[in-house]
Amino acid sequence: MKGIRNFKEFIKAGIVKIQTPDKSRAEFLIKEAEQGYNYLLEVIEKIGIKNENANDYIKRCYDILMELVRAKMLVDGYNASGYGAHEAEVSYLRTLDFREIDVQFADQMRFFRNGMLYYGTILDKEYAEKVIKFTKENYLKLKKMS
């Protein structure tokens, strides 16, 4: 996995477009993330974390965090689409003053989620626990920014 590019490079490449802020779409994404987060916590409490549900939790965590990043981007007047959009959204975390180690972890989540969706990658309980911890640590921070 190579290092993630700077956000401005995604603008230059046309992957991120500058647009009028879209607060209504951002509000929708925030609400979706909130519902997804609450559901995630409920399912974890009732079912627990196992190897058998690790992939599902990892995908859900990634989606929750990226919905909040997309919401913040929309409020700030940015929209990522097409090939490289997910990488651009992860890169946007740097502009939000996330630590580089957290940007790299989010990029690793993106990489593994892509592997799950397109290549049949199977992840384990241990990694799912790390992802859930990361999500819990960053959910409120992102939500407050959005």
How should these model regions be labeled?
Residues 1-146:
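Terminal alpha-helical segments
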